[in-house]
């Protein structure tokens, strides 16, 4: 699903490439990028800079913590760049109802994409029903608000079997995308994890 959606987005600008071009233009690549600022000490000036960079390069979205959602949405208005907000970030340890409420608030504030963190502890404990309920709560809130739901599974904390199960549960819950990591754990995205998740 990720590749298909991204390819469709890239196609908007890919036509500008020369017939013998070795690959996509920078503009096509830009439509794959979620320009992100999630550090706890981010200031209004820093968030504004991220927004302005995203507008300049026509990135896919700007991803921020909940407190900045309305500000980012206002700053990006008319640019074609989407507002993305994280939910249950970075630990994933909130109750499903809390994540759903956070999602609904983010959508009211203008978010078009939600990056939720799965309940990693429940996943590692084999509590699949809880994990499924966790993801579904956010997916349903996204569906009701017309937003995209992406599930962050925090691969650095998982075994390969747990990564597979997290992806399967995300698909079962009808999430739109699955992502590797928050950037706050001991490791981030690897090509091996991406290949495993896509298999």
Stretches with model-predicted labels:
Residues 1-33:
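Charged, compositionally biased N-terminal leader segments and the immediate start
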Residues 20-57, 61, 67-199:
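Alpha/beta enzyme core
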